[in-house]
Structure formats: structure tokens, C-alpha cells
Amino acid sequence: MRGKKRIGLLFLLIAVVVGGGGFLMAQKALHKTSDTAFCLSCHSMSKPFEEYQGTVHFSNQKGIRAECADCHIPKSGMDYLFAKLKASKDIYHEFVSGKIDSDDKFEAHRQEMAETVWKELKATDSATCRSCHSFDAMDIASQSESAQKMHNKAQKGGETCIDCHKGIAHFPPEIKMDDNAAHELESQAATSVTNGAHIYPFKTSRIGELATVNPGTDLTVVDASGKQPIVLLQGYQMQGSENTLYLAAGQRLALATLSEEGIKALTVNGEWQADEYGNQWRQASLQGALTDPALADRKLLWQYAEKLDDTYCAGCHAPIAADHYTVNAWPSIAKGMGARTSMSENELDILTRYFQYNAKDITEKQ
């Protein structure tokens, strides 16, 4: 009996030693396959590594570096193991399928890969980001005005890091919107109009030789009998910039640019009045034949603008509500962000006007 017990204890000891050794070896293997050197042993990772080298996560004044695992592998037990298991597909694609073994293939799959990572981070409330960054540790008052606004908004709205910080360590995918959306907008242009109707250009248009009218501008039809409707454009002139008509005094949302003939043809509807900054404004209007098709409902143009926002802007950050900024602030903000996308000038102009017409200081949303 004693012999059997000793044999049993011996087997138990061997099992403990083998199990413990196996556990330690597994831990060692998991740790070793999580370091940056292992990640870079795959040829396909050389491209994202070069992108990462140009970011503050690689080099900064604090001397703190975020390695691959810091961003891509959660620290907690099961999430950690699941991440390691899912990463096995990368080894398969590297050595078997060759899915991203060239620059062209990598770019073709960049959006798919990026969206996979964004989805994982969203699902974990950006857990790997929060292992270094937390709202509790932030001195928000010392941040830039824009960062303060966005971080306060994120805290109140329950947003997570990846909502706004896409493309923080690697280039974001270059997303383009299908041309069908623009063609559909053109197909919805009003085919007939009546006197008193309101119509809205969906692209830069002309009122004869008098003015160039911007997308979204409200035009009132005063004579629909001819081939080209005669429209009324109403706005505000600013002293020193008389060749532009704006939406309202003090609000620099340009409705149209006037030619010399257009300035002469203006009907002035009031005296010059100063705004709070001393700029002089007066009401004015212009009538003429609209030479281009227009929409009968401006909401169609704004729906197109929202698609532009979802396609080009949401790839880098969470949607920013139009009423987050003022009508005068939006142009420079949209221009700065739009420069990082592949939007055309016309697309950026439409999106900017959508933001302006629905800005926080526009009392009646357009």
C-alpha cells in the first residue's frame, strides 16, 4: 500500500513539475511573442512600423514609448488570451495566404484592418489606451481649448478614446465616397418651379453675369415663366467687402460673390449699421436669372453633406455636432481637417456650409 502511495505521490510531483514547467514555458512564449521585435519579424509589419516611428507614441519629450503590445494586447487574463489567439491569423496570412505581403495588398486591406482594430477598441472601452491615459489623471485645464472641449464632451457623453483618436499611431485608411451619391443629388434637381418657391443650388452656380452663388443658398423664385427662373437673393453686405453677400450681419457665411455688374444691380434695403466689433453691415438683394439647376429641398443637400461627414471625417474621430462651433469658427476648422482627407474642393465646401448653416449661433436651423 505504501508503495502505491509513493508511486502516486511521485506521479503527482512529476505532474506538478511538468505542469508548472509547461505553464512557465507557455508564459515565456506568450511574453516573447508579444514584444515588438517579434511583431517586426514579419515583413508585412515593416510598413506600419515606419508609420508608427513618426508618432508621439514612438518618440516624445517624456521619453516614454508605447510598444505594439501596449496598444494591441489587453492586460487582463481572458482578453489577453483571446487577443493572442486572434493574432494567430496574422501569422497565417504572413506565411501562408500572403494577404498583405506587398504594399499594394496592404493598402487594399488597410481599411478592413483598421476597422477591425477600431471595433475591438470600442468594445473594450479603449482598455489599452486607458492603461496609460485616464480622465482622472488629466489636467484638462492645461490642455488646448479644443482638447478641453472634446475631453469634457467625451466624459459627459461616455465616448471612448478610439472615437476621436483613430490614426494616432498608423495612417488611417484613405476613404472615398461613391460617386453615385453626387449623381443622385443632381438627379433630384427641381425640373419645374413656381413663383414664390424656394430653391437651393447644390453646386457653385451663376445668376447671369451678376453673381456666383454658393451651394445651399436660399433663392426665392420671382418669375418662373422663362427657361431660366428669375430668382431673388437676399443677404448682407459688409463695408470693405462689398462684393460678397453674407447670411446675416456679423455672420460670415458667404451666400454669393458679386461681379462689378452685380454690385451695381444690387437693391440696398437699409442703412449701414455697426456690429459689436465695429464692422458696418447693410441688407441688400439681387435679382437675376439662375443659369444652373437647383434643389427644391435643402435637406437633400444636407443629407449628402452628412454622408460626406460619415465617410471622410468619422474615419478619424467621432462625429462633431454642427452646433459645437459658431458659424464663423467652422470654415477654418473644416479646412484644417479637410486637408487630411481626399475630399474635393466642392465636397469640402458643401460640408463646411452644412456645418455653418447648423452652427450653434444660427437661431433658426437651416
From Swiss-Prot:
It is a single-pass type II membrane protein. Heme 4 binds at residues 161, 164-165. GO terms for molecular function: electron transfer activity; heme binding; iron ion binding. Disulfide bonds: none annotated. The chain crosses the membrane at residues 7-27. Its main location: membrane. InterPro entries: Cytochrome_c-type_ET, Membr-bd_4haem_cyt_TorC, Multihaem_cyt_sf, NapC/NirT_cyt_c_N, NapC/NirT_cytc_sf. Residues 28-366 are periplasmic. Heme 2 binds at residues 68, 71-72. It comes from the Bacteria. Heme 5 binds at residues 313, 316-317. Belongs to the TorC/TorY family. Part of the anaerobic respiratory chain of trimethylamine-N-oxide reductase TorZ. Required for electron transfer to the TorZ terminal enzyme. This is Cytochrome c-type protein TorY. It comes from Escherichia coli O157:H7. The lineage of its organism: Bacteria, Pseudomonadati, Pseudomonadota, Gammaproteobacteria, Enterobacterales.
